[in-house]
């Protein structure tokens, strides 16, 4: 929106006594400034004042036991190492907590896993040592530097060393990390993966794709698990003792029995032994917290606090062994199991699933018995939100900033349908919404599985929540999701009933589930949970505009001076020839990245076997096989992730229009303009990463005409078939190409079309594009969002463009919209927001999410981050604190089209 138009709107609003320089205060006031409980607010303050901390306690005990168990069966050896690590975790209970335990001994933080990937720590070892040697200094300047990033420790200070641009580690622990990392050189999943990848004849191509950021990162050793839905059924139904007894009985039945396959039948014995070892470690971990709570009770003088510690002791001692009896016990157990799951591996996106339906049995029975009130439930859910927000994922700076933006994608799905096709909404899900409105934290993000059968008041409640500006719930088309389940998993026996059990894994990965029959106090309930492999551990983020760049540059990356692909040496005389070379390069990229990823994940499943997640999900316990042996019910989950789709579409449209249809410019003139960035500085030099505030250096006007023509060329998002058909043709082709790819489980793959935060770094690695985007600026976000400022014909024209193709045949698509808060003010505004959402989903859109925020607020927050510690925005499938986002993503969010009328 132009400054003059924005000023005019602002003056009109102010004339009516409506202030527009806010995020969502008008909408907040509608709901009487909903606030969290005093207890939750106090603990949220603890979170705000806590830095992300990395420590070596868990890895130390893991590594020590792993060495000690050398020579044992790999899966049992790993189980013993995990058992030792969990058993030795130092308990830490913050005063006022009713839900306890966390990833480490620190309130917020994580730990490195050099057995998965150690090269970063080895490479940075000397630098970290030097940082640790520096004299301690606690200057205000240093505090300000890392404070501006919220909980991120972006620079070293005092006795704290910054690692990966996010975590702080005490300097005395740094030598332990470096020493341990060196022990894993040549033996980690990462190093073994590199060793065997090099045996591929086209390994050099794979390395070129990685070094030029055409592919964002290797998933096999970076984030091998996650972007999936956890399953809490077995602990909730049987208790931990019950699972141990089950494993012991199964162990007796399978010992020495090959069961006819001659390959993995014998592995069942070792898997069941590993299950027993790990659960014993988890029980010790829980009971250590119970002992700590008992100690705190003994020294507490306040009678109310003393009673709370006593309650914690009883809860923890019970759930360490038995099925939970109450809602609070069930909530504590599911949270504990969740932390255990994400501590097992380098994981982001271990999503919670249909939580309101999973915990409903305990909620229903406690309410009926008068054991708990709705307000008490809401407070517990507020506390749960804070605990989930405390989860950090330890990864390299590139992954943390360039993909995760500090988020861990623990998505909670609401709505959808039950097994019998009736509405999945219930009273507990309404309370989950209420808790998220009162206690606005980035985690867990909510996703509404929209279905026409859901009650209107439930949907209105969700729309009210969205209006508050937290970015959630996002809205997903339940019908599309079940259709995709049936298509992708038909060969593995997917039924319509089972398809209804799906939920969102990670930020937006449609993930298969199943129904299990849970019995509580003699009453049986059907609950959903995850039943599939990682739905996001395939080829990680192909940069679509970068592939097109290399088509134009004959396979060469001029920024890096690397010949990535073999030169095609074609004159590109026709548009069809451009498309032909693009498809060839794209298929080459998928093929080599898919095979390299298969090698990495194969090594991961052999040496870093998942035990906790395996024992949780059907049908591993029934089969006696872990995830690596396809113990899960659904295994065709690995995908090909892409980024920058609309930037690519707009670029193709510009080439077609300007070079081949109108013949206004030659392909050589376009290439020259791109190499010279249309006469502008690179965004990296300027320090601004949207198209705003870029600096022109060419004074001759040589590129003015071609630059204007590129900007004026047809753009996606305006219901213009010239551009939109390019998207349609690409989507049809991409789906077929991905199905030709094969994961290590010999299953077909599929497209995953989300940007997360990759449109920032991948945009930074890309020259100017034919659509007029300048070098180093971010790509378009999502996959069907319009490029910032190019959707000129309103939101409904954008919806027409987005639904020109069948979005139900792929895992997902992503639509981000930014609305001015006054646009949806009041009850009518809530209805308007719901109608807007419905209109898109009814047209076949898969996903839509909103930022309800004034751009001026974001600009001020960028300049004065300390004044906006609690400000949250929706990025691309997830919500994050504004001050913890990198500037490229901040610039992109600010630049998004802001709709004042819908």
Swiss-Prot record:
Keywords: Lyase, Organic radical, Phosphoprotein. The keyword Nucleus does not apply. SUPFAM superfamilies: PFL-like glycyl radical enzymes (SSF51998). GO terms for molecular function: 4-hydroxyphenylacetate decarboxylase activity. Residues 38-774 form the PFL domain. Glycyl radical subunit of the HPA decarboxylase that decarboxylates phenylacetates with a hydroxyl group in the p-position. Active toward 4-hydroxyphenylacetate, 3,4-dihydroxyphenylacetate and to a lesser extent p-hydroxymandelate (2-hydroxy-2-(4-hydroxyphenyl)acetate), forming 4-methylphenol, 4-methylcatechol and 4-hydroxybenzylalcohol, respectively. Is likely involved in the catabolism of aromatic amino acids such as tyrosine fermentation. This is 4-hydroxyphenylacetate decarboxylase glycyl radical subunit.
């Amino acid at each position: 929106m132009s400054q003059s138009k924005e000023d005019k709107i602002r003056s009109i609003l102010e004339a009516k006594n409506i202030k527009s320089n806010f995020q969502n205060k008008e909408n907040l006031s509608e709901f009487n400034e909903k606030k969290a409980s005093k207890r939750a607010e106090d603990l949220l303050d603890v979170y705000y004042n806590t830095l992300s901390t990395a420590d070596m306690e868990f890895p130390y005990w893991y590594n020590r036991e792993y060495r000690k168990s050398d020579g044992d069966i790999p899966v049992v050896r790993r189980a013993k190492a995990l058992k030792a690590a969990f058993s030795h975790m130092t308990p830490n209970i913050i005063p006022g907590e009713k839900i306890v335990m966390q990833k480490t001994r620190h309130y917020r933080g994580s730990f490195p896993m050099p057995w998965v990937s150690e090269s970063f720590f080895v490479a940075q070892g000397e630098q970290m040592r030097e940082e640790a040697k520096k004299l301690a200094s606690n200057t205000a300047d240093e505090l300000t530097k890392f404070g501006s990033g919220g909980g991120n420790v972006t620079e070293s200070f005092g006795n704290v060393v910054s690692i990966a641009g996010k975590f702080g580690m005490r300097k005395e622990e740094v030598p332990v990390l470096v020493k341990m990392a060196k022990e894993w050189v040549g033996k980690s999943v990462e190093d073994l993966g590199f060793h065997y990848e090099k045996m591929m004849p086209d390994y050099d191509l794979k390395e070129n794709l990685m070094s030029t950021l055409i592919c964002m990162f290797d998933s096999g050793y970076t984030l091998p698990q996650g972007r999936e839905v956890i399953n809490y059924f077995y602990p909730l139904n049987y208790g931990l003792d019950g699972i141990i007894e089950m494993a012991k009985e199964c162990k007796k039945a399978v010992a020495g029995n090959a069961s006819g396959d001659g390959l993995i039948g014998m592995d069942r014995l070792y898997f069941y032994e590993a299950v027993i070892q790990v659960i014993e470690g988890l029980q010790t971990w829980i009971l250590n917290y119970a002992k700590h709570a008992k100690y705190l009770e003994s020294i507490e003088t306040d009678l109310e606090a003393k009673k709370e510690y006593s309650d914690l002791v009883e809860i923890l001692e019970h759930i360490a062994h038995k099925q939970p009896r109450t809602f609070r016990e069930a909530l504590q157990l599911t949270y504990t199991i969740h932390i255990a799951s994400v501590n097992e591996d380098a994981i982001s996106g271990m999503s919670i699933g249909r939580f309101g339906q999973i915990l409903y049995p305990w909620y229903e029975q406690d309410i009926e018995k008068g054991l708990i009130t709705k307000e008490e439930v809401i407070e517990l859910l507020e506390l749960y939100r804070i605990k989930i927000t405390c989860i950090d994922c330890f990864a390299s700076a590139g992954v943390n900033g360039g993909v995760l933006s500090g988020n861990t994608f623990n998505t909670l799905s609401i709505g959808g349908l039950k097994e019998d096709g009736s509405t999945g909404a219930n009273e507990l899900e309404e309370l989950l919404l209420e808790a998220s409105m009162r206690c606005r934290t980035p985690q867990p993000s909510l996703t509404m599985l929209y279905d026409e059968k859901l009650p209107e008041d439930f949907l209105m409640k969700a729309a009210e929540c969205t209006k508050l500006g937290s970015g959630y719930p996002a809205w997903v088309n339940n019908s599309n999701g079940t259709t995709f389940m049936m298509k992708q998993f038909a060969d593995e026996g997917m039924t319509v009933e089972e398809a209804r059990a799906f939920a969102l894994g990670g930020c937006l990965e449609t993930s298969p589930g199943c129904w299990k029959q849970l019995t509580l106090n003699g009453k049986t309930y059907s609950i959903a949970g995850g039943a599939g492999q990682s739905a996001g551990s395939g080829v990680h983020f192909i940069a679509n505009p970068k592939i097109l760049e290399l088509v134009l540059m004959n396979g060469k990356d001029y920024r890096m001076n690397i010949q990535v692909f073999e030169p095609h040496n074609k004159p590109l005389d026709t548009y069809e020839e451009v498309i032909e070379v693009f498809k060839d390069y794209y298929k080459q990229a998928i093929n080599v990245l898919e095979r390299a990823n298969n090698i990495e994940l194969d090594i991961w499943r052999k040496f870093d076997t998942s035990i906790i997640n395996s024992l949780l999900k059907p049908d591993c316990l029934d089969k006696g096989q872990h995830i690596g042996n396809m113990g899960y019910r659904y295994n065709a989950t690995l995908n090909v992730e892409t980024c920058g789709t609309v930037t690519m579409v707009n670029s193709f449209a510009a080439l077609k229009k300007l070079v081949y249809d109108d013949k206004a410019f030659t392909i050589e003139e376009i290439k020259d303009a791109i190499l010279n960035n249309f006469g502008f500085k690179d965004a990296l030099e300027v320090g601004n990463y949207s198209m705003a505030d870029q600096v022109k250096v060419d004074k001759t006007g040589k590129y003015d005409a071609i630059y204007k023509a590129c900007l004026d060329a047809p753009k996606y998002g305006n219901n213009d078939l010239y551009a939109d058909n390019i998207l349609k043709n690409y989507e049809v082709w991409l789906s077929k190409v991905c199905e030709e790819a094969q994961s290590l489980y010999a299953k077909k793959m599929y497209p995953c079309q989300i940007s997360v935060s990759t449109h920032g770094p991948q945009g930074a690695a890309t020259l100017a594009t034919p659509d007029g985007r300048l070098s180093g600026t971010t790509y378009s976000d999502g996959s069907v969002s319009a490029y910032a400022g190019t959707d000129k014909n309103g939101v409904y024209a954008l919806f027409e463009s987005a639904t020109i193709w069948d979005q139900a045949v792929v895992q997902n698509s992503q639509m981000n919209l930014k609305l001015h808060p006054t646009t949806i003010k009041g009850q009518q505004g809530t209805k308007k927001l719901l109608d807007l959402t419905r209109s898109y989903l009814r047209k076949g859109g898969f996903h839509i999410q909103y930022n309800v925020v004034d751009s001026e607020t974001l600009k001020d927050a960028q300049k004065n981050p300390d004044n906006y510690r609690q400000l949250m925005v929706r990025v691309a499938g997830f919500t994050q604190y504004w001050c913890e986002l990198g500037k490229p993503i901040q610039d992109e969010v600010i630049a998004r089209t802001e709709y004042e009328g819908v």
